[in-house]
Amino acid sequence: MAEVHVFLRRKALPRINPIRFMERVGFTGRYPALDDATKYAVMAAFLGHNQPPTNDTFARAAAWPGFALHLGAPWLSVSPDGDGAVVTTPQGPHRFDFLVLSTGLVSDPGLRPELRLVADRIARWADRHAPPAGQANALIDAHPYLGPGFELLPRDPADAAALHGLFAFNYSALISLGLSASALSGLKNALPRLVRG
């Protein structure tokens, strides 16, 4: 491989890692006890920063002779071109042999094919918490609203049986239970909670 190009919509590479603050043992252990308004505010602030690449990872990538970082370069279009593709950004067209996409995280159970039979029954944060006017966050609102043991909760109590035995021990637990199943540093508190659940 002669070249690797990384495109970011942002004009600057994130430099603040909000996870460092959230990894403190007291925070990871006590986060689930916070009220919904506090959880919502904390996660809105967290998600507003994004996470930078690790220094080691970035240094190794940048040392690669064919590495190129394109900041402020959202993809405006992608079209086939022979055996490859052309990506157009505000800086112009770029031709590639192949594309690898990593476009962010959306934790909406409705997007998961394995949950298609019950997705409409799963409670989301939008169903359980109304943030103050002007502070709604669609990314947070789409997350499942989980019980204390990572269990999926129903929008309607009549649907509880349909969700029995379904747990979200993954990144989608972030809003309800904090850095639990979404980071190695959270497993110390998360695994016992999952087992008890």
Spell out what each predicted region is.
Residues 3-197:
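Flavin (primarily FAD) cofactor-binding/catalytic cores of flavoenzymes
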